[in-house]
Structures are given as structure tokens and as C-alpha cells.
Regions:
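Conserved sequence signature across two-component system core domains
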Residues: 7-8, 34, 52
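Extreme N-terminal starter segment of soluble prokaryotic enzymes
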Residues: 1-4
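Residue-level detector of secondary-structure boundary/capping sites
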Residues: 8, 25, 139-143
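Two-component/phosphorelay signaling modules centered on CheY-like receiver
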Residues: 11-32
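CheY-like receiver
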Residues: 23, 38-139
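Generic detector of well-ordered alpha-helical packing
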Residues: 9-11, 56
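Interdomain helical linkers/hinges and coiled-coil/dimerization scaffolds
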Residues: 107-182
Length: 182
């Protein structure tokens, strides 16, 4: 379940968004609402939401300032901007920080839901990619370890010119690194 924070200086908008959308059906947990940019910033640092739905103009920090600050900390956090301002400069600045969802007020419930679904889909793809990369790294390490063990075992099977002391030291180090894999 992804976590969502709603930030808007208008109480009616915060409450409407929180109550009219069936967040549970979207597998989203609304972790809080913030009445200004500073409160939103502090809540983000405390609650680590995956998605922040924010107004563009708020007291304390604007939505753009909030996005900029959070971008420095967590580039994976996703933002949906709700704005009453149809100004290209706002959207352009937001896009520089990875924001892909800029909704004009008044927007419909369905527009918010569509943005949430897109973000969720992108999130699932990113997580799948991270898991594949982690699995790849693990398999690569297992492969190299197995290759090294096989090379060493082949060398030992051919016989060596090691003294008994050197052989004991070698086997001690071998077991330390590879266990009893012989």
C-alpha cells in the first residue's frame, strides 16, 4: 500500500479530496493532510509518503519549493500538483523536478484517480526493476564465487607444490571465504 499526503491551504479542498475518493480501493493510505508548505515538509520527513498531492501556492513553502526541497532528498517521491493557475512556467518548473501530473482546479475525482493509478503503475515497474537488478547482482556474485571455487578445486586436484604448512594455511583461508565447498 502506497502512502499519500495531501497539502493544500484550503481546508475544504483537503477534506473533500480525503473523503470523496475511495483510497482503500486504490490501495492508498492517506497518512495526513497539511495546511501549508512547512507543515507538509515536516510531515513528509516524518511520514515518508510515496505520493504528495499538493497545491502550487501555499503559505510557508509553495508547492514548487516543497517539490524542489524534496527532490534533493528523495528523487523517487512522486508529486501531483493541484493548481488554480494555468501558467506554463509553473508546469515547466515542476517538470524539471520530475512532476508529471499537473491538474488544474477544479479537477474531477477521476483526474486524481487516473494520476494515482499512473503513479502506482510507474512505482510497480521501478520496484520490479530494482528487484531484477538486485537478483542479477546476487546471481553474478554466486557465479563468480562458484567459478573461483571450481578453479581452486581444479588446481588442488592437479596437485600442488605447497608445503604442509602452506596447504593448511590455504585451506583455512579457503574455508573462511567459501565454507566447506570443495
Amino acid at each position: 500500500m502506497l502512502k499519500l499526503l495531501i497539502a493544500d491551504d484550503e481546508k475544504t479542498i483537503r477534506e473533500t479530496i480525503r473523503s470523496f475518493i475511495d483510497w482503500e480501493a486504490l490501495d492508498i493510505e492517506v497518512v495526513g493532510t497539511a495546511k501549508d508548505g512547512i507543515e507538509a515538509y515536516n510531515m513528509i520527513l516524518d511520514l515518508y509518503p510515496d505520493i504528495v498531492l499538493t497545491d502550487i501556492r501555499m503559505p510557508g513553502l509553495s508547492g514548487l519549493e516543497l517539490i524542489e526541497k524534496m527532490y534533493e532528498i528523495n528523487k523517487d517521491m512522486q508529486f501531483i500538483i493541484l493548481s488554480g493557475y494555468n501558467e506554463f512556467e509553473y508546469a515547466k518548473t515542476a517538470m524539471q523536478y520530475g512532476v508529471r501530473h499537473y491538474l488544474l482546479k477544479p479537477c474531477s475525482e477521476q483526474q486524481i484517480i487516473n494520476s494515482i493509478r499512473e503513479i502506482k503503475q510507474d512505482y510497480q515497474i521501478r520496484m520490479a526493476q530494482k528487484n531484477i537488478l538486485a537478483e542479477h547482482d546476487q546471481l553474478k556474485n554466486q557465479f563468480y564465487t562458484s567459478m573461483l571455487i571450481n578453479i581452486v578445486n581444479h588446481y588442488l586436484a592437479q596437485g600442488s607444490d605447497l608445503t604442509p604448512e602452506q596447504e593448511d594455511s590455504f585451506y583455512t583461508e579457503y574455508r573462511r571465504h567459501f565454507g566447506n565447498a570443495r
